Amino acid sequence: MPDLTPLWISIKVGFISTIIVSILGIFICRTLYKRKGHATQFLESLILLPIVLPPTVLGFIFIIVFSPRTFVGQFFQNVLHLPVVFTMTGAVIASVIVSFPLMYQHTIQGFRSINPKMLNTARTMGASERKIFYRLILPLSKRSIIAGIMMSFARAIGEFGATLMVAGYIPNKTNTLPLEIYFLVEQGKENQAWLWVLVLVAFSITVISMLNFANRDKVQEVD
């Protein structure tokens, strides 16, 4: 019977990071979806930066920012009592940063795809912006939001480079599935590595199939 600890650690990291990403994503998209201009474009570029930056660069930035010598690192360690470097907290933060762009992209596209005339009609009928958001925008964007959540969770489960640099490989503490596969191969244990490879492949196929099924239903509704 294989040790299932890496699986549970990955699920825990993915679950926590996805909750954080979902809340932040909806909140930030609510703030930005109606705004235009250079400032908004610059902010969106920063949000999407983790998609194109090499994981090692992200990991290096995380180590510098969350080092115990910095204000941010001291705040997490002394105020929140959550040391970041070489801990599960670091793995969660790394997963949040790399998966957030996916949540943002899907959610903001959902918000911006809503017909503005519908929202303006609601305003003329006396609906507040808060009511419009919760009664119209969120329900109409639910497919995009769910897709963003699924993609963010999948990305968090598969995160490797930044997690390795920030959280390291500490057995029973930070050894997520991608890290476990890497170090099993390093130790010449390919047969054990294959088990986790198949788990991740099956998980990825499941996520993609669910997204394709949801998109197919959406196309049928439009037709």
Segments (PLM) and residue ranges:
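Interhelical loop and adjacent transmembrane-helix boundary motif
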Residues: 1-5, 166-205, 209
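Transmembrane-helix boundary motif in ABC transporter permease subunits
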Residues: 16-47, 60-62, 110-113, 117-118, ...
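C-terminal transmembrane helix and the adjacent membrane-cytosol boundary/short C-terminal tail
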Residues: 39, 108-124, 194-223
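Membrane-interfacial helix termini and adjacent extracytoplasmic/periplasmic loops
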Residues: 59-96, 167-170
